[in-house]
Regions:
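Cationic, amphipathic, low-complexity alpha-helical segments enriched
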Residues: 314-320
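Conserved small/polar residues in nucleotide/adenosyl-binding loops
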Residues: 307-310
Length: 320
């Protein structure tokens, strides 16, 4: 088990396999964004090797993210390979859902354990306004097929004042009707997100309890993330809130992040970490990499710091 200086056991890694995306969400990735060269992106065999090394040190859970992970060719082969690594207990995926319907059979065959789908609106015109693509029906079809398959499913919604807050009741209704966890992620007021007004988690909960007075907080955790979950009598699913600003969750953080360029981040909001790509391509042994990772994780920050950030990369890591 890898433990940091504050005795937090690190057993979960989020791996971004690409910085590319087939949407241009206004708060995340505008039209004029520039991308990293393919030669700088970790190859699948490099990602697999990193996970093998980390699994030997106690990492048991892996989340595959992007950008949009499903746009990378043969990503399901990577999922299958990671699933076969001894010690890895769970491999999950976060996607915008555009390609979910077409790729669902391969994802299920690869053994993905759960899927998170990012969806901020159920309205076709609003979806196109927020994302730059008329694909709402495609995403909803993918969600429906995934739900029918029985795979554990979560929806991630970023509530934005004046953009989609009038749909909160519909998101609540989804959690009531379907065995799905609907999670509301607080907007970060950094980078492109500064131009939008976030909705605090307590406002989400106020509206939820107003609509469902008998609602209650769940004591159990659903999955590996920091969300706090609630339900109500008659609900098939749950709602969750992730208060990135107003309710920090640093004291229980159990995760590290690997960027698509091979940089191991200790904290989403910190520049500290380790260039694993340089070590891999520089000929370092597995033991040398393992020792370097163990040492750098000991320096994992106690709490969030918002200084010296690459805001574009932070936003992509938050919402993808």
């Amino acid at each position: 088990m890898i433990t940091d200086h504050y005795n937090r056991n690190i057993d979960y890694i989020r791996i971004s396999i690409t910085d590319r995306c087939n949407l241009r969400c206004r708060y995340c990735m505008p039209e004029d964004i520039s991308f990293v060269g393919h030669d700088k992106i970790l190859r699948y065999e490099e990602i697999t090797r990193i996970v093998q090394i980390l699994a030997q040190r106690g990492i048991t859970k892996v989340k595959i993210t992007g950008g949009e992970p499903l746009v990378r060719h043969e990503c399901t082969d990577l999922i299958r390979e990671i699933k076969e690594i001894p010690g890895i207990e769970m491999v999950t995926l976060t996607t915008n859902g555009i390609l979910l319907q077409s790729m669902l059979p391969k994802l299920l065959e690869a053994g993905v354990d759960a899927v998170n789908v990012s969806l901020d609106t159920f309205q076709r015109a609003r979806y196109e306004h927020l994302t730059g693509k008329d694909a709402c029906e495609m995403v909803l079809a993918g969600i429906q097929d995934a739900y029918k398959s029985g795979i554990p499913l979560k929806l991630n919604c970023v509530p934005i004042e004046g953009e989609n807050t009038d749909e909160l009741s519909e998101f609540f209704s989804w959690a009531k009707r379907k065995q799905i966890a609907v999670r509301f992620i607080e907007m970060m007021p950094i980078g492109y997100g500064k131009t939008y007004k976030s909705v605090p988690s307590d406002e989400i909960l106020r509206q939820f309890f107003e609509a469902y007075p008998d609602a209650y907080r769940l004591e159990k955790s659903l999955g590996n993330g920091p969300a706090v979950y609630y339900s109500a009598p008659g609900f098939a699913g749950e709602i969750g809130v992730i208060g990135a600003i107003h309710e920090k969750f640093c004291n229980t953080c159990n995760r590290i992040r690997l960027t698509s360029e091979g940089f191991l981040k200790l904290c989403l909001y910190s520049g500290e970490g380790l260039d694993l790509r340089a070590m891999l391509r520089g000929g370092c042994s597995d033991e040398e990499i393992a020792e370097a990772v163990t040492k750098v994780i000991e320096r994992k920050p106690k709490a969030v710091s918002y200084t010296h950030l690459n805001f574009r990369k932070v936003l992509i890591l938050i919402f993808m």
